[in-house]
Every structure is written in C-alpha cells, then in structure tokens.
Amino acid sequence: MPSFDIVSEIDMQEVRNAVENATRELSTRWDFRNVPASFELNEKSQSIKATSESDFQVQQLIDIMREKLLKRGIEGGALEVPEEFEHSGKTYSVEAKLKQGIETTQAKKIVKLIKDSKLKVQAQIQGEQVRVTGKSRDDLQGVMALIRGGNLGQPFQFTNFRD
C-alpha cells in the first residue's frame, strides 16, 4: 500500500546562509547606516535574535530575515516571532524561534483534517511525523494538496513516499 510521511524540517545550513545574507544586506541599506543592528543565530536553541535601536527597526529586521529565508527555500511560517520585543537600555531585541518537528497538538489537527476530508486513507502519529497510508496514489496526492491548502501555521514537507 502506498504511503508517505508528513514532516516539518528545516535545513540549518540554509538558515545559516540566510542569516549571513541578511547581515550583508544590513551593511548596504541606507536606513541602517550608523545603527547598531545585528542578527545572531543560535543553532543549539534553534533561534535567531534580531537587535536594533527601536522596535520599528526590529520589525524591519524580522521582515528582512523572512525575505532571506524565503529566498533560501524556507517558508516564513517556520519563524515564530513573539509579539513583545525585549527592551534593555538603548536596544530592542527579539528572539524568533525556528519551528521544527510536528508537536502532538499539531499532529492531532493534521489527523483530524485528513479524517474530516473523507479520503480513503489512514493517518497515524509517529513521534514528530505523521504517516499517511492509502490504497491509491490519487488519494495520497489529495491529502498532500489538503495539507498544503490547509492553513496550519507551519510549513510541512512530504518524505518517504512508498509505492
């Protein structure tokens, strides 16, 4: 029986490249001239810290980072930015987390979405991924379209397609 896995993974090398590209863009933008603005990638906690003088500039930094991530093939939904910015002294900063892996609550939403679609497939949660099994490839492709179209707030990839 054909099957595939729904996963949410981020290539950290591409994230590193995006951070370097964003830092390079900061040095060429006129609105960030003589402004202590920076990006900092923490691979251990899988987060990106943006720091600048004002909250408006921090928001611009986040927009630049999303643009660079998108150019490197990582969707903007993979970056989870908190509403409140940290303020200490003269600087504002925000630590945006990179979403990787499917949490249990998110996996349950995916399984419920698949079951409510009435497609003849079975979905089961396996750790940080969801395995979908069906009798025909067409049903599995329908599930892929459903997941891509469903606004689930996180980018997903489809791996391990077996016939």
Curated annotation (Swiss-Prot):
Keywords associated with the record: Nucleotide-binding
Coiled coil: none
CDD domains: YajQ_like
Nucleotide-binding is among the record's keywords: yes
GO molecular function: nucleotide binding
GO cellular component: cytosol
Function: Nucleotide-binding protein.
PANTHER family: UPF0234 PROTEIN YAJQ
Family: Belongs to the YajQ family.
NCBIfam families: PRK05412.1 (NF003819)
Protein name as catalogued: Nucleotide-binding protein PC1_1036
Organism this protein belongs to: Pectobacterium carotovorum subsp. carotovorum (strain PC1)
